[in-house]
Amino acid sequence: MMDETSTTETVAAAELRQFIERVERLEEEKAAIQGDIKDVMGEAKGRGYDTKAIRTIIRLRKKDANERIEEETILQTYMAALGME
């Protein structure tokens, strides 16, 4: 009985270690990708593009059309309420 518990704990520890190591590898890949994105944005900035606008466009492209329209409508409503239009 004790041997079975020990085996179960060993298997659980090995499985836990695998999960942790997978996440660590993904974090390393994520850092590399973030570095690549930074390089691309630096290149765009060097060519005269506004990186803030590029990031906004990327964020908007991730949303579906209805969500974008709703966000724009709310923004326009708030701007009008503040006399900004």
UniProtKB/Swiss-Prot annotation:
Signal peptide: none annotated. It holds the Pfam family GapR_DNA-bd. One of its GO terms (molecular function) is DNA binding. Belongs to the UPF0335 family. This is UPF0335 protein Atu3758.
